[in-house]
Amino acid sequence: MNPLTQVKRTQVINQKEALLGIGEDGSWHAKFKDSAYVFVGGIPYDLTEGDLLAVFAQYGEVVDVNLVRDKGTGKSKGFAFLAYEDQRSTILAVDNLNGAKVLGRIVRVDHVSKYKKKEEEDEEELQKKREARGVCYAFQKGECNRGASCRYSHDEQRNANTGWGSKEESKARWEHDRHHEPPMSHKKFPSSAGEQRFPDRAKEENKSTGREGQSSRSEAYKDRDSRLRHSDRGSKDHDRYRHDRSPERSRGDRQRNNDRYAQGRDEKSERYRSEVKHDEGDQKRSRRDTDSSGHYERRGNEDSERYRKSRR
């Protein structure tokens, strides 16, 4: 919950209790009758323990002030815990100072039910505990920014002689995470034929001139020649690929594809027109044939009738 919202809610509860005339036994303060500590939040960072004493001493005698500070920098974190000699002074402090402005900031004051005072530990004991926990690996790398609040040892001599890499190696789950050799991403491979390593010819000449020595030298030179040919072929393929992927070539390919598509579309439309004309010619020819056949049939009928009449 927002601290300002908590301040307003506490003020509303106090106003309602005052209007209703609720006594101490029925008040919400009665839940904290066993604690003489109050929490103070929203403190300006410039305030010190003496300033807090001057502000809160007007409602009772303050016996303990714990202004929480950062262990590394020593700067205030903006909140504190105060203890009164009389527990009833906490009620006055909460009712009157909750929501008050101190150096332009609204201060929140509330009861603390169970406050456990942190025991001050000796610096030697803290150092022993840090040594028992182990070495700060972030400090070894120069990345630890916790300062004195770090729970691990910052002893430079011990950090230099720990050999923490072996510990990391023992905890590594996968084989490639172990520190036997640099990772593959850190290795340098030859990028051209000139950077490749080949057997030294002088060393090969120093070998015995026997049959085995001659065969080993010839095999080494054969391997070198094959690797050179392979690297030359790879460079040529790379250049050809770059030429194929050039913008001018891709633009020309697109233009040729567009021309080929337009030519195919024109041929298809021309073929369609010729088929339509052919179908129309077939329909006219079939219509003419049917008309002529009917005409010849009628003429044959007339001739047969005329022949019958003449025979009668």
UniProtKB/Swiss-Prot annotation:
Superkingdom to which the source organism belongs: Eukaryota
Record PANTHER family: RNA-BINDING MOTIF PROTEIN, X-LINKED 2
PROSITE patterns: RRM, ZF_C3H1
Recorded GO MF terms: DNA binding; RNA binding; zinc ion binding
Gene Ontology annotations for the cellular component aspect, listed alphabetically: precatalytic spliceosome; U2 snRNP
One Pfam family it belongs to: RRM_1
Name of the protein described by the UniProt record: Zinc finger CCCH domain-containing protein 25
Skewed-composition ranges (Basic and acidic residues): 166-184, 197-210, 219-312
ZnF (C3H1-type) intervals: 130-157
Organism: Oryza sativa subsp. japonica
CDD domains, per the entry: RRM_ist3_like
Keywords annotated in UniProt: DNA-binding, Metal-binding, RNA-binding, Zinc, Zinc-finger
Sequence segments annotated as region (Disordered): 153-312
A biological process from GO: mRNA splicing, via spliceosome
Domain annotation RRM: ranges: 36-114
